[in-house]
A protein has these predicted regions:
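Extended recognition/assembly regions associated with phosphoester-bond processing machinery
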Residues: 1-537
């Protein structure tokens, strides 16, 4: 079965972690949407779709639709833990019909305070300092020894953070030493702490979290019960990412069965309240953030882009913008997914980059562009990704090309920019994270001090001998993209920006019921940290 519609359906099911057998293909292709099937499979714990399981899941969705109006609020999502915010959470259901595109409305001048955005960018010289970029520094050969070195590096870096910042109640034991003395450490009076990579994370029937903690010496099976006062973000309720670094305090339960480590508490890497650096008053310019332009796609919003260029040239707020950060997927690419060609209006990859260069030439010359790659760009898919090839770069001016992720400073303000592919893994694993709230994934990355912990998930990773996806320094501004949402907010002193897209809703997003938030330019002043979200749609 190879129709374009089936390919899109199959892609959606695969993205949801479902395996489709041949016997179920005809039945699924006849469905109007696979969204109810995916939701029923997730709530039932089903991963293999055959003829029988599909019929059973469809029966569940049919029954739920009959009782929904009497028992459930239309926008509620019962698979997530209850939060303090009683508003609806989860996916935003998008219209089934493709929206009719109308010309963009003329913009009024931005209403902003000159105290928040005090300086024109043309008066200030550029000051971009790159702290880390993988370009030209990748040394992996893809061997098992490289993978082992990468995980040892991750464990060593984050364990040292835990020890230096005092987040552990005592000095941790090596797993081998803890196991050797398990009969001594068999009650709360003899509690110990271990630190390692979490894996094989599962919830038991009683609601406890069962997982393995592995360090350089051995593995130990652990179990964690939700505390009575646990918040929805506590690991016992929210979950753990495979291969994230955790500390665990507790004791061994020994008896007739194999000993298991009873976890009284779990410890995350340190993330205190961060004090942001500020650009000096004489450098009080702004940075603008955008991602996922997807030039070359038929759903690229060209009229709105022209409107943004007009804003850059004429709006008083735009005159404060010194830097324009594009966090990946500047073009839609070629051959990224099956059937992509029919969604493209520029089908040659170099022509896509050439047209993007021409469009960026229209940005005023006082603005410096910082461009990262993403999963649609012409670089290796494995992260960390190097900058775009010099053959592509030669068409651009006033553009600094960096890798993904990139840790850099603008007039002393530390910025961590990451395209955000691993948000897919956070959505698939943690109960608190949804595509409609990408800021929860960003918060989880900061709390774990790692951008993409899970090996073998939805995010391809390069096993560099030193794990360069660890977050060694807390950024002043943390920027992501990828899922076509938008958010600006603070988490423990770090300003989080989830950059908007310049692509309309795609067929794939419509099938998933996801409504993007396109054409929003985020502007942040580097001295005052005042921010403005400029809407162009």
């Amino acid at each position: 079965m190879s129709s374009p519609r089936w390919q899109e359906m199959h892609q959606a099911l695969t993205a949801a972690g479902l395996i489709v057998q041949k016997s179920a293909e005809n039945r699924i292709e006849n469905l109007q949407s696979v969204v109810p099937l995916i939701e029923a499979a997730n709530s039932s714990g089903v991963r293999l779709l055959n003829a029988n399981s599909v019929e059973e899941l469809l029966a569940i969705t049919s029954h739920e639709s009959e009782v929904q109006s009497d028992s459930v609020k239309p926008n509620s999502q019962t698979t997530l833990p209850k939060s303090e915010n009683e508003g609806p959470i989860g996916r935003v259901i998008a219209p089934l019909q493709r929206p009719h595109l109308t010309p963009p409305r003329p913009r009024k001048p931005s209403g902003f305070s000159s105290e928040d955005f005090p300086l024109e960018a043309s008066e200030v010289d550029s000051d971009i300092e790159i702290h880390f970029d993988i370009t030209g520094k990748s040394s992996t050969e893809g061997r098992i020894s490289d993978m082992q070195s990468c995980f040892r590096s991750r464990l060593s870096q984050i364990r040292d953070m835990m020890l230096s910042k005092g987040v552990l109640p005592r000095r941790p034991l090596a797993n081998s030493d803890a196991w050797r003395n398990r009969r001594r450490h068999n009650s709360k009076d003899y509690e110990i702490t271990i630190v390692g990579l979490a894996s094989d994370v599962k919830w038991t029937r009683t609601g406890s979290l069962r997982f393995i903690v592995e360090d350089e010496s051995s593995q130990i099976m652990c179990i964690l019960k939700p505390p009575n006062d646990a918040s929805p973000l506590h690991a016992s309720l929210d979950g753990l990412m495979d291969d994230e670094i955790v500390g665990v305090s507790g004791w061994f339960l020994t008896g007739e069965r194999d000993p298991i480590f009873f976890s009284r508490d779990i410890h995350k890497p340190p993330l205190g309240n961060h004090s942001k650096a500020q650009a000096g008053e004489e450098y009080a310019v702004s940075a603008a953030f955008l991602s996922d332009v997807h030039l070359g796609s038929k759903t690229f919003l060209a009229p709105q882009w022209a409107k943004m260029i007009d804003w850059f040239k004429n709006d008083p707020l735009a005159r404060t913008v010194k830097y324009f950060v594009l966090s990946g997927d500047g073009v839609d690419g070629v051959g990224i997914y099956p059937g992509q060609e029919r969604h493209l209006n520029i089908k040659d990859l170099f022509n896509q980059y050439g047209e993007l260069a021409r469009m960026l030439e229209e940005v005023p010359d006082w603005v410096d562009v910082v461009m990262l790659p993403g999963n649609h760009d012409a670089v290796r898919p494995a992260e960390p990704q190097p900058a775009l090839d010099p053959e592509v770069q030669q068409d651009y001016s006033n553009t600094v090309f960096v890798g993904n992720p990139c840790d850099f400073s603008l007039h002393g303000v530390r910025v961590l920019s990451y395209h955000g592919k691993s948000i897919d893994d956070f959505v698939a694993t943690l109960r608190s994270v949804t595509y409609s709230k990408p800021e929860m994934a960003m918060q989880a990355m900061l709390e774990r001090r790692h951008l993409a912990p899970s090996w073998g998930g939805k995010t391809p990773l390069s096993p560099e001998p030193e794990d360069r996806l660890v977050i060694p320094e807390i950024p002043d501004i943390f920027v992501t993209g990828h899922v076509h949402g938008h958010f600006v907010g603070d988490h423990k002193g770090t300003l989080m920006v989830h950059s908007s897209t310049w692509q309309d809703q795609t067929d794939f997003q419509r099938m998933l019921g996801f409504q993007p938030k396109p054409c929003i330019l985020t502007v942040v002043n580097l001295h005052t940290y005042a921010s403005e979200a400029i809407h162009f749609a």
